[in-house]
Amino acid sequence: MLTCLSRRVLVGLFSIGILPLNAMASGSWVADDIGITQSVRGVAISAKPLQSPVALAQDNARIVSISWRYQLMSAAPDGLQVKLCTPTRCMPLEGGSGLSRGLAGEAAATQLTFIYFIAGKGRVNPPLQVINHQVIVNYR
């Protein structure tokens, strides 16, 4: 009885538009890793790619949004630029944490790579030390 009632409630919510039809196909995955150390300006350093820790149930799942976070050992050096990239495109990150739809439409099972770049030439003192970085990928 409860199962039948639950099914009727869900069908009703779908039919009046309170729940989108693809609401049950949504999901998210989280991945994190230790960061990088960078001591030279003008050189882009890619961190180890992050990917879904388990195979996704849907092969055609697409990214809706991504939350990111990276932690630095000390203050960010002048000229620091950080991007989050798939194999086909990148989005610049504004600050150490946030939420973006900049990679929406990409395959949800794709690898994501943090790329760190410090504009200019010469050594960075103290070196940039990224303690860790994390992504939360929301997909549908």
Swiss-Prot record:
One of its GO terms (biological process) is bacterial-type flagellum organization. Residues 1-25 form the signal peptide. Keywords: Bacterial flagellum biogenesis, Signal. The keyword Signal applies. InterPro entries: FlhE. Not essential for flagellar formation and function. This is Flagellar protein FlhE. It comes from Yersinia enterocolitica. The gene is flhE.
